[in-house]
Amino acid sequence: MRILVTNDDGIYSNGIRAAVKALSSLGEVYVVAPLFQRSASGRAMTLHRPIRARLVDVPGAKVAYGIDGTPTDSVIFALARFGDFDLAVSGINLGENLSTEITVSGTASAAIEAATHEVPSIAISLEVDWKKTLGEGEGIDFSVASHFLKRITRAVLEKGLPEGVDMLNVNVPSNATPETEIAITRLARKRYCPTIEERVDPRGHPYYWIVGQKREEFEPGTDAYALKIERKVSVTPINIDMTARVNFEEVRKVLFAQP
C-alpha cells in the first residue's frame, strides 16, 4: 500500500511526523508538505511563480519533500512525482477543522484535492489551545490522535470508503483517550464570523487584521456538536460533488417560471 501524507502546518510540524509514525506500519509512506506554515490557505494553487522543492528527513517515510507552495500544490506535486496512491492523509493538524468552513482549511483542502484525483483521503485534526495552532506542536501529545488515525486508515485500506464518500474529515478532542466514542457527523453551518479590525501604524497609515468570533452553539448531529459538546471523535463523510440534493424541477420553477 502507498500512502501520501501532507498537511498545512508545514513539514517540520510534530503533527505530520506523528502521522507518519502511525502509518509507517501500514504501507509505504510518501511525504510532500509545505516547507512553512500554510494554515487557512484553502485549495489555493501556486500559478504565478515556480515551486521549489527540497528533500527533508522524516523518520518512517520512504521519501519526503518540502515545497514552498500550498497543501494543494503538495498533493499535485506528489501525484506527478510518484504516481498514484492508495490513500492520502492530511494532518495531524494543530487545531480542529469543523463546519462548512473546512473549505478554508489547508488540511481539509489537501484531502479534497487528493479526492478529485480519485485517491481516497482522510483529513485529521487535533483540538489544541488556539495559541498553539501556528507552532510546530511543541509539547503536544499526538498519541491518541495517532491511535484513531491508524484505526481509521486500516479500515479504509482494508474496506475502502463507502459508496458516495470521497474523504473523511476527522476531529479529535484534546482530552480524548483511545476509548473515546466516535460519532459519525455532518458538517455544522458557518462557525466563524469574521470581520475587519482597522489599526494605524506609527506613520499614520491604516492596516487591517481579519478578526472575529467563533459560534459556540451547534445543532446535535454536527461535527462541532460532537467535538465541542459531546467530546467525541467526529468523523464526517464528505462528497466533493457540492451539487445541492434538491428537486431540479423545483429550482426551475423558482428561477424560470413565467409570472
From Swiss-Prot:
Family matches, as HAMAP family: SurE
Keyword Translocase in record: no
Reaction it catalyzes: a ribonucleoside 5'-phosphate + H2O = a ribonucleoside + phosphate
Upper taxonomic lineage: Archaea, Methanobacteriati, Methanobacteriota, Thermococci, Thermococcales
InterPro entries: SurE, SurE-like_Pase/nucleotidase, SurE-like_sf
Cytoplasm among keywords: yes
Protein name per the record: 5'-nucleotidase SurE
Required cofactor names: a divalent metal cation
Keyword annotations: Cytoplasm, Hydrolase, Metal-binding, Nucleotide-binding
Assigned EC number: 3.1.3.5
Pfam families, per the entry: SurE
Details of cofactor binding: Binds 1 divalent metal cation per subunit.
PANTHER family (alphabetical): 5'-NUCLEOTIDASE SURE, PHOSPHATASE, PUTATIVE (AFU_ORTHOLOGUE AFUA_4G01070)-RELATED
Record-stated family: Belongs to the SurE nucleotidase family.
